[in-house]
Amino acid sequence: MKTLLLTLVVVTIVCLDLAYTRKCYKTHPYKSEPCASGENLCYTKTWCDFRCSQLGKAVELGCAATCPTTKPYEEVTCCSTDDCNRFPNWERPRPRPRGLLSSIMDHP
């Protein structure tokens, strides 16, 4: 009887472990969600677009089976633990002074 009980416990643990899915943050909307079967990596992809100087880099978060390949202007980081791809925490770019205020600040 003890052997049967032990066997059931082992089978349950093995089955639960096989059904595990990675959780990663995803964009649009920004929230943690389970990844599809076979996608065991979380990634963060950043790049500059036409709004980069005002808003900072564009960000894409998601799941992948392999770390995504990058284009020359992109940066990608991959990780393999749950929710390891949080939204990057960087400072928003500050606008440069322009016009009359700029000339007053440049020449005290």
From Swiss-Prot:
It comes from the Eukaryota. It holds the Pfam family Toxin_cobra-type. Keywords: Acetylcholine receptor inhibiting toxin, Disulfide bond, Ion channel impairing toxin, Neurotoxin, Postsynaptic neurotoxin, Secreted, Signal, Toxin. Belongs to the three-finger toxin family. Long-chain subfamily. Type II alpha-neurotoxin sub-subfamily. It is found in: Secreted. Gene3D superfamilies: CD59. Residues 1-21 form the signal peptide. SUPFAM superfamilies: Snake toxin-like (SSF57302). The keyword Transferase does not apply. Expressed by the venom gland. It comes from Drysdalia coronoides (White-lipped snake). GO terms for cellular component: extracellular region. GO terms for molecular function: acetylcholine receptor inhibitor activity; ion channel regulator activity; toxin activity. This is Long neurotoxin 13. Disulfide bonds join C24-C42, C35-C63, C48-C52, C67-C78, C79-C84. Binds with high affinity to muscular (alpha-1/CHRNA1) and neuronal (alpha-7/CHRNA7) nicotinic acetylcholine receptor (nAChR) and inhibits acetylcholine from binding to the receptor, thereby impairing neuromuscular and neuronal transmission. Its main location: secreted. The keyword Signal applies.
